[in-house]
Structure formats: structure tokens, C-alpha cells
Amino acid sequence: DSRGTQLHRALRKATILSVSARCKLSGYRCKRPKQCCNLSCGNYMCG
């Protein structure tokens, strides 16, 4: 239903904001290298 979709959309927006606001330290989950402080993302983990 639309309520679930809105919630999901808001959640995704918040996640994107948190990722762009500050980088992830080594050991955190990542999808792209630029999400990590050292720009290293291997095996879905910051290196």
C-alpha cells in the first residue's frame, strides 16, 4: 500500500543523507568505495 511505500522512501532518503554527510569507517557496510573514509570498499565492507 501507499503508506508502506512512503515510509520506505523516507527511510531511503534518510540513509542517503547520512552517507553523504559523513564517511564510514573501516568495517562498516558499503556499496561504493566513495562511501568509505579511505575510499576502499571490498566485499561490502569499508577496508
Swiss-Prot record:
Positions of the propeptide removed during maturation: 1-22
Compartments it resides in: Secreted
Disulfide bridge map: C23-C37, C30-C41, C36-C46
Modification type Cysteine amide: residues: C46
Annotated domain remarks: The presence of a 'disulfide through disulfide knot' structurally defines this protein as a knottin. The cysteine framework is VI/VII (C-C-CC-C-C).
Tagged with keyword Disulfide bond: yes
An example Gene Ontology molecular-function term: toxin activity
Name the UniProt record assigns to this protein: Conotoxin Bu10
Cellular compartments per GO CC: extracellular region
Protein family: Belongs to the conotoxin O1 superfamily.
Keywords attached to this entry: Amidation, Disulfide bond, Ion channel impairing toxin, Knottin, Neurotoxin, Secreted, Toxin
Principal subcellular localisation of the protein: secreted
Keyword Secreted: yes
Tissue specificity: Expressed by the venom duct.
Domain of life: Eukaryota
